[in-house]
A protein has these predicted regions:
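Activation segment signature within eukaryotic-like protein kinase domains
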Residues: 115-116
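AlphaC helix of the eukaryotic protein kinase fold
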Residues: 44-61
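Regulatory extensions appended to serine/threonine kinase catalytic cores
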Residues: 264-294
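Conserved short submotifs of the Hanks-type protein kinase catalytic core
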Residues: 82-98
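Short beta-strand micro-motifs within the conserved protein kinase catalytic domain, predominantly
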Residues: 70-87
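Conserved activation segment of eukaryotic-like protein kinases, specifically the C-terminal portion
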Residues: 167-181
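Catalytic-loop of the protein kinase fold
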Residues: 127-143
Length: 294
């Protein structure tokens, strides 16, 4: 694409993985502007063609979401030396780090719940557009210095109106993947993403990698330090049987909204009445926050 010829590679961000893609950081000549270039190799092969097309289509659909990486262009190129056809996706540069590299123990409860809410915002928009991410994990969640969340890597997403038999490979299976995805990646539904969200929340609030799905409920029973209202929500998210999980992300939001109100909506003013003597008594015993006034 001619508009990106004035950009030079300044760093290699990742080598080829299971999606056969490389990621580079580009800088515009004589400028402080940066973008990211993702090159998917071997797109003559149906699998990698599907990966390229899916990610490109998904990102264009979701391009207005604040919490999903933005696409700024795409191209088909041919390698000069090998003649290999490659697909290229140009993305916004996110000045941040993967959630997996964040010092979890240094995050406050408010910051953790903010990350969760932004993640839900991103996946809600994705699901509303018929897109299942299929690979939600801490390495695909970027966090900026200002704690803004950006979900990345839609390379193995499932688009409901795009069924392709070429993707009969097992992709994206890790400790954050739902058990049905481990059996076959095309088994993924919205509930599979919800399982992954639950696994991410578990990691965020414990600092530990999630256990196997078959052990998750027992592990959750012995978890310490997690908010008493959050625990049953996570348990439902990571149920081994998809039928036992939340029906959709809207149902999840309904349950978790009270926690968001407690930890995030702290600037709201609440007015209530009580006898003044009772009020003084509660304040004396420190049963009301000092911010509560007459």
């Amino acid at each position: 694409m001619s508009t990106f010829r004035d950009w030079k590679v300044v760093n290699k961000l990742s080598d080829r993985g299971q999606t056969n893609s490389e990621v580079h950081l580009l800088q515009k000549k004589d400028s402080d502007e940066f973008i990211v270039r993702k090159v998917i190799h071997g797109i003559d092969h149906p699998l990698y063609q599907a990966i390229f097309t899916r990610e490109m289509r998904a990102l264009y659909k979701l391009n207005k979401s604040e919490n999903i990486v933005s696409i700024v262009g795409d191209d088909y190129l041919k390698e000069t030396k090998t003649g290999e056809k490659v697909g290229v996706i140009y993305l916004e540069y996110i000045n941040g780090v993967e959630l997996g590299k964040v010092q979890i123990e240094n995050l406050s409860s408010k910051e953790k719940f903010s990350i969760v809410r932004q993640l839900l915002d991103a996946i809600e928009i994705s699901h509303s557009n018929g897109i299942i991410h299929r690979d939600i994990n801490p390495n695909n969640i970027m966090v900026t210095e200002d704690k803004v969340v950006k979900v990345i890597d839609f390379g193995i997403c499932k688009i409901n109106d795009m069924i392709n038999s070429a993707t009969v490979f097992t992709l994206g299976t890790n400790a954050y993947s739902a058990p049905e995805v481990h059996q076959h990646s095309e088994n993924a539904t919205e509930k599979s993403d919800l399982y992954s969200i639950g696994a991410v929340i578990y990691y965020l609030f414990t600092g530990k990698q999630p256990p196997l799905a078959v052990q998750f409920q027992k592990t959750m029973d012995s978890v310490r330090g997690m908010d008493i209202e959050l625990k049953p929500i996570v348990k439902k998210l990571v149920a081994e049987n998809p039928d036992d999980r939340y029906e959709n992300i809207f149902e999840l939001r309904k349950d978790i909204s009270r926690l968001f109100m407690r930890f995030l909506d702290t600037e709201k003013t609440v007015v209530f009445t009580m006898a003044y003597e009772r009020f003084k008594e509660l304040k004396n015993f420190k049963l009301l926050p000092q911010s509560v006034t007459v």
